[in-house]
């Protein structure tokens, strides 16, 4: 089998010496979100405010908020429409207000904010008319059950969702970050991919212009 792989690499012009130079020049890390099989990714411990450059672009900020709310509700099995779903509208307003105050939210903080939102009105309606407290409690319970589910702690461990750390080590060595999500359910895969791409877009928006290639994002086996 080793000979087969060696021949295949050689057919693509990848000699052993070239591969050895790559291995020496870069760090390779395999990330396994939601699992400790590789390096876990801490994706749910804190929903930090986007960088200032992204916050100043209302269209991008709105997209970040909607994607975050949609992805979280999908984890609960809720196919929430941003326009008609009161759950989606509530979460979107919570993130909008918190991030405007430059405050991050961990999952526990989000649960508390669902029960006691940092505002009294949504649109022109008072909060209790739009989303009564007993119904908000049910939504908070669903998030709490998710947090308490066996194995869920793996989503709260490991390296933070930080694009800079995915590209370079602490010593400045280039890093090839490989994310494997084959062990996740379809819903969990979509959640992780959405959150990762959100972070990448936010990182891109903070970078100054350049004519040099900074990073490559490659996605394999998309169905």
Language model: regions and residue ranges:
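P-loop NTPase motor domains
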Residues: 3-223
């Amino acid at each position: 089998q080793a000979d087969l792989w060696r021949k295949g690499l050689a057919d693509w012009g990848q000699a052993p010496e070239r591969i050895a130079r790559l291995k020496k020049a870069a760090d390779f890390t395999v990330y396994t979100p939601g699992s400790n099989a590789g390096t876990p990714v801490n994706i749910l411990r804190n929903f930090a405010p986007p960088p200032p450059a992204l916050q100043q672009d209302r269209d991008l900020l709105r997209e970040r908020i909607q994607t975050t709310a949609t992805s979280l509700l999908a984890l609960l099995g809720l196919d929430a429409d941003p326009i008609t779903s009161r759950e989606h509208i509530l979460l979107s307003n919570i993130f909008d207000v918190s991030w405007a105050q430059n405050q991050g939210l961990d999952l526990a903080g989000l649960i508390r904010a669902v029960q006691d939102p940092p505002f009294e009105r949504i649109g022109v309606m008072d909060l209790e008319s739009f989303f009564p407290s007993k119904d908000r409690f049910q939504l908070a319970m669903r998030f709490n059950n998710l947090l308490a589910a066996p194995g869920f702690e793996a989503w709260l461990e490991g390296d933070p969702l930080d694009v800079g750390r995915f590209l370079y080590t602490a010593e400045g060595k280039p890093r090839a970050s490989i994310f494997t999500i084959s062990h996740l359910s379809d819903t969990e895969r979509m959640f992780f991919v959405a959150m990762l791409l959100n972070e990448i877009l936010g990182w891109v928006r903070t970078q100054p212009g350049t004519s040099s290639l900074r990073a490559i994002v490659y996605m394999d086996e998309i169905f």
